[in-house]
């Protein structure tokens, strides 16, 4: 006997329609960059290969599923994902147990960058590309006793909160392709809050050194003013990185004032805000409305530490006047964003030097101030990356009590963003179609679809065929089964 209440409910056990119609395109990119091989060394879990579990998790993140239970439900309801996974239904417990296992996700992150950046010339790292360095706070209000959480001040929320402090790097290429690189979790010493086991500068050095295992190209490091540290600048110079950052209002700068009667150069302290006031009228006359304008200020120096021998021949650290490129800028992308907070309320000294909307950039490239401005403007891409990850991929949605699960969740988001950014770049690079990150996910990847089984498997999109036909035909996979290689199974007709 079937209860009347249950009989009145529709039965969708074998439904042939659902969301995620563009997941096969995500699978094409996954196979193009060989991401399955990154997890080939992991043993099967619950009868499933590790790369299938990872792909299922990434597909769930793209569908904006905010929990492991929702991800498992999405994978079981989407007919095309079931076909890609070989008809296997993934349970919530299988995902939870797999991503709570001990695994070196930091090494996996490095292998992801190597695999992606070595696959084709368009994804390669070249001279002049920009590495954006920044951190963000991932709030966890109910996890005060978790050892990897910190009690920090959030400028956007204007309050202190318990959070996980994520430090990461992002690559912005000259062709416009954006790729998330490495990440680290900064841990604060809760007994002595003024100290930590490792500083964020140490984590930044570690990530930039790992990037040297992938490429030896001459790169820019574009960073927020929080990373303004003289020792860090010297470290970047010694590791063949160019750098650019915003100047703080209390940064000690010096201007060359000629030389004395012995021919020795004379320097006088100069306030960054006063430098901006001097060139402000010239600055607002340059450039066009809504575009970045800049004016280079010559003969600006900063004291950087260097090891030099003293009279006894012993190496000691001395502060040496070093020329820097000082550029007054206005209308930077980050300054034109209304959601951005202009002042650090927790530490007023961290406020950027400014004058009527103009800011001062400093860089080691004295010979190329224009390139320094372009490199710093690209730093805004990492802010957009954080925003997209939180709003569309659920960066703040992991509530596990183990650090391993959080590390796995972060790496899954970085994998998803690597693939999504490449797809978005392919869609927009010709200029015929202009889609934002969210529009691309909604109109292509998460488009509604219906599967029809005949001699071959047909898939019908609920999206604009004419707009995306060429793109879908180009990147539609030949085979639906996800494996280490291309498996000769049923064909997917690219008839959109």
Indicate residue ranges for each PLM-predicted region.
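An anionic, glycine-rich sequence signature occurring as long contiguous blocks
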Residues: 178, 193-197, 242, 248-381, ...
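Short, conserved catalytic/metal-binding motifs centered on acidic residues
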Residues: 56-57, 71, 91, 95, ...
């Amino acid at each position: 006997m079937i209860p009347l209440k249950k009989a009145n409910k529709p039965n969708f056990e074998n439904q042939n329609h659902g969301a995620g119609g563009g997941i096969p395109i995500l699978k094409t990119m996954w196979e193009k960059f060989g991401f399955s091989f990154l997890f080939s060394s992991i043993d099967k879990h619950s009868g499933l290969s590790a790369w299938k579990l990872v792909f299922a998790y990434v597909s769930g993140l793209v569908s904006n599923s905010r929990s492991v239970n929702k991800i498992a439900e999405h994978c079981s309801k989407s007919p095309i994902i079931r076909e890609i996974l070989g008809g296997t239904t993934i349970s919530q417990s299988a995902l939870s147990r797999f991503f709570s296992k001990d695994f070196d996700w930091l090494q996996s992150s490095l292998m992801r960058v190597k695999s992606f950046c070595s696959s084709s010339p368009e994804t390669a790292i070249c001279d002049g590309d920009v590495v954006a360095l920044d951190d963000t706070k991932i709030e966890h209000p109910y996890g005060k006793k978790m050892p990897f959480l910190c009690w920090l001040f959030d400028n956007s929320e204007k309050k202190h909160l318990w959070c996980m402090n994520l430090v990461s790097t992002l690559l912005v290429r000259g062709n416009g392709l954006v790729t998330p690189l490495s990440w680290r979790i900064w841990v604060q010493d809760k007994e002595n809050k003024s100290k930590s086991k490792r500083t964020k500068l140490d984590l930044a050095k570690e990530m930039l050194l790992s990037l040297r295992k992938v490429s030896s190209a001459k790169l820019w490091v574009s960073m927020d003013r929080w990373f303004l540290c003289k020792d860090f600048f010297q470290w970047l110079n010694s590791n063949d990185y160019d750098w650019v950052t915003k100047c703080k209002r209390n940064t000690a700068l010096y201007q060359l004032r000629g030389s004395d009667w012995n021919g020795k150069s004379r320097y006088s302290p100069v306030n960054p805000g006063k430098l901006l006031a001097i060139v402000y009228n010239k600055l607002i006359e340059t450039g066009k409305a809504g575009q970045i304008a800049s004016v280079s200020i010559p003969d600006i120096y900063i004291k950087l530490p260097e090891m030099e021998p003293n009279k006894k021949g012993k190496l000691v650290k001395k502060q040496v006047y070093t020329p820097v490129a000082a550029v007054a800028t206005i209308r930077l992308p980050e300054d034109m964003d209304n959601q951005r907070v202009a002042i650090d309320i927790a530490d007023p000294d961290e406020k950027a030097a400014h004058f009527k909307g103009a800011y001062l950039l400093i860089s080691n490239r004295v010979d190329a101030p224009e390139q320094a401005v372009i490199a710093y403007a690209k730093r805004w891409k990492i802010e957009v990356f954080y925003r997209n990850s939180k709003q569309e991929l659920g960066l703040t949605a992991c509530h596990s009590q183990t650090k391993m699960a959080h590390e796995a969740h972060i790496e899954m988001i970085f994998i998803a963003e690597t693939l999504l950014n490449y797809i978005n770049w392919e869609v927009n690079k010709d200029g015929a179609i202009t889609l934002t990150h969210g529009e691309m996910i909604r109109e292509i990847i998460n488009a509604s679809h219906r599967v029809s089984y005949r001699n071959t498997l047909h898939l019908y999109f609920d999206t604009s065929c004419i707009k995306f036909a060429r793109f879908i035909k180009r990147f539609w996979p030949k085979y639906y089964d996800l494996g280490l290689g291309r498996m000769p199974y049923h064909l997917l007709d690219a008839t959109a």
